[in-house]
Regions:
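Active-site-proximal beta-strand/loop segments in catalytic clefts of secreted hydrolases
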Residues: 1-2, 12-15, 59-62, 134-137, ...
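Short catalytic/ligand-binding loop motif for oxyanion handling, primarily in non-cytosolic enzymes
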Residues: 5-6, 64-68, 139-142, 159-160
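Short aromatic-enriched loop/helix-cap "lid" or pocket-rim segments at secondary-structure transitions
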Residues: 8, 67-72, 164, 198-200
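Structural recognition of the beta-strand scaffold that forms the well-ordered cores
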Residues: 9, 54-58, 129-133, 142, ...
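His/acidic metal-ligating clusters that form di-metal
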Residues: 16-136
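Binuclear metal-dependent phosphoesterase catalytic core
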Residues: 103-110, 116-125, 137-222
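Extracellular low-complexity, Gly/Ser/Thr-rich intrinsically disordered linkers
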Residues: 133-140, 239
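Hydrophobic alpha-helical topogenic segments used for membrane insertion/localization
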Residues: 227-249
Length: 254
């Protein structure tokens, strides 16, 4: 019995930016999806009972089902994030009913324009209890939809864009061999391990607030702290302009 497979971990190639497949991000190939199903059958046969082995999968780009961890809200909702590409024009926040405590949505989910049925394939294969992705550096939520956990880990370094320094980190997984489905996961963040600030907070600030399109601008304006800051700057500028006009008026009056 000691030679039996208790649980498995798989990595799938989501193929990045693949213009041969779509106008947007690529998707796992049909061969990769078939492999994810076939390997479960093979492990079940090796174990002798044909039962699906509890398994967790990892890949870079999330499938469209990650949007099912969100709830659509009006565009004026504070901290709402506008969807990307196929989901553009719709605004979302985390669905707290399906997401674990501590989950964060920091940016749009950057998935492929096409749904190739990967999540459904994992369900059909049996045994898969979670799929975790990266790609969207500011996201760190874990939600349970379609009978499977869908989750993120944020960026952990400082050579690329991401959230505030204290929110960058790695995701730790703890599995029990006798029940891997009831796993425990948590983030080990820079704020917890090192401190709140990095050695280059100016760069981190720019990366956190940098926008490259209208969607990014709208998302920034939904962040209350950004709105308050802009209102404060606007108030100071209006006060300064009013003071200058008053001085100019007095000069003409003389």
């Amino acid at each position: 019995r000691e030679s039996l497979t208790s649980y498995a971990k798989y990595a799938s190639n989501s193929r990045g930016w693949d213009l041969a497949d779509s106008d947007g991000y690529g998707t796992p190939s049909p061969e990769a999806i078939e492999w994810l199903k076939q390997v479960q059958r093979e492990l079940g046969e090796r174990n002798g009972d044909g039962s699906a082995v509890p398994a967790i999968a990892f890949q870079h780009i999330p499938p469209q089902e990650f949007y099912d961890c969100l709830r659509e809200v009006p565009a004026y909702t504070p901290n709402a994030v506008e969807g990307a590409r196929t989901f553009a024009g719709h605004c979302y926040v985390l669905d707290r009913d399906v997401c674990r405590p501590g989950s964060r949505l920091g940016e749009a989910i950057g998935c492929a324009d096409e749904n190739v049925g990967e999540v459904q394939a994992l369900r059909d294969a049996g045994g898969y209890f979670a799929l975790f992705c990266g790609h969207d550096h500011k996201n760190s939520f874990v939600g349970h939809v379609h009978d499977i956990d869908l989750g993120y880990a944020p960026t952990c370094g400082f050579e690329c864009y991401g959230p505030k320094s204290r929110l960058r980190g790695i995701r730790l997984f703890e599995f029990r061999e006798n029940n891997p489905v009831s796993y425990v996961t948590r983030l080990l963040t820079w704020g917890d391990l090192v401190g709140r600030y990095s050695s280059n907070e100016l760069r981190v600030f720019f990366e956190d607030h940098c926008v490259t399109d209208l969607i990014g601008i709208r998302n920034e304006l939904r962040r209350p702290q950004v709105t308050v800051t802009l209102l404060g700057i606007g108030s100071v500028m209006c006060a300064a302009a009013g003071h200058a006009i008053a001085k100019l008026f007095k000069r003409f009056k003389r």
